[in-house]
Amino acid sequence: MLLRWLARPAERCLGRGGGGGGGGGGDGLLWHAELKPHASGEYSIAVAQANAELEDQGQVVTSPAATFVGVYDGHGGPEASRFISSRLFPHLHRFASEQGGMSTDAIKRAFHATEEEFLHMVKRSWLKQPQIASVGSCCLVGAITDNVLYVANLGDSRAVLGRRGPDGREVVAERLSNDHNVAEEEVRKELTEQHPDDSRIVIYTRGVWRIKGIIQVSRSIGDVYLKKPEFARDPIFRQYVCSIPLKRPVMTAEPSIKEHQLRQQDLFLIFASDGLWEQLTDKAAVDIVFKNPRAGIAKRLVRAALTEAARKREMRYTDIKHIERGSRRNFHDDITVVVVYLDHHKHGVRPNLGNRNSFRFTNAPVDIFSGSSEEVDHHPLRLNLAMDGAVG
């Protein structure tokens, strides 16, 4: 019962629609929340849905001492990204609290705990629902505390820092995450070295590089059949889900983690799923944030990406926004964007992350059907229940 309650946090507040903060200017598949405060500034969040079921999930958790951002880009279905949205932060809070503060080790342990918990769920469910073994999600996390930013990721969602340039009038884009995607030559080389006896570990098919001809990302939460060969070898799974046999794991859940000391010239952060970065360069995105008002800035980035997606098809954004979910995936991917402004940097004693009552949760909707619902801002009591479920 508790897991079902946790699995759909946004749905409890939104129903199954989205659209807080006034919707997307006539786009029923674009949702955003109004500008909100965090420990060292303000943040903005927006989501555009393309798939029949929204496979992206985004969340921001704030307290007086810390800010946490999560962007989870699912594939094969929404189950993994929704699972991460309900489980990762409770694990991270627990491990960081046990260690007396945020650290790369606490983040790594939280990722591993989430992966193991998802694996257990798959083992319980997969005989009745074999496709659950093929569901996965990229996972991008940012945590700010005591003037230090931690960025951790699996997959190809991306965190980009906008910092003031030397002349003070321009902004420089600095990427803070690694793309675990076989489109990157370095990732292909890594896989080839790990699988020297498999000449087909990475295949160019359908216009892109894919691991075993199946998937583009090399690290994720989930995708159990590509990490646990016994699932891929099962006759039922091979008949109904994937017929390619595997001898050993071809993906991992080992996050790349970067620790960055915030500086006065660091102005803002953009966390986004690859749906944004498929359309906009890092520099184009930071220029949009730097040159425009804060109100609705995440929505502005999403609309810029949708405009570019339309341009590539010799269309206008006004044409795309009338296309229904599902069909819209032919033009762009689901897009989740969180912009975090860095207005003041707090120095001093390493702070306690805060007790459970001090956190405020903002989750993007589970699905977006309209532009009229209220934005999601979870009461601390709900977070208490989530924490209790994680620790128990």
Swiss-Prot record:
Binds 2 magnesium or manganese ions per subunit. Mn(2+) 2 binds at residues 73, 274, 333. One of its GO terms (molecular function) is metal ion binding. Its cofactor is Mg(2+); Mn(2+). Mn(2+) 1 binds at residues 73-74. GO terms for biological process: regulation of intracellular signal transduction. It comes from the Eukaryota. Residues 39-342 form the PPM-type phosphatase domain. It holds the Pfam family PP2C. Its EC number is 3.1.3.16. InterPro entries: PP2C, PP2C_BS, PPM-type-like_dom_sf, PPM-type_phosphatase-like_dom. It catalyses: O-phospho-L-seryl-[protein] + H2O = L-seryl-[protein] + phosphate; O-phospho-L-threonyl-[protein] + H2O = L-threonyl-[protein] + phosphate. Signal peptide: none annotated. Keywords: Hydrolase, Magnesium, Manganese, Metal-binding, Protein phosphatase. Belongs to the PP2C family. This is Probable protein phosphatase 2C 78. It comes from Oryza sativa subsp. japonica (Rice).
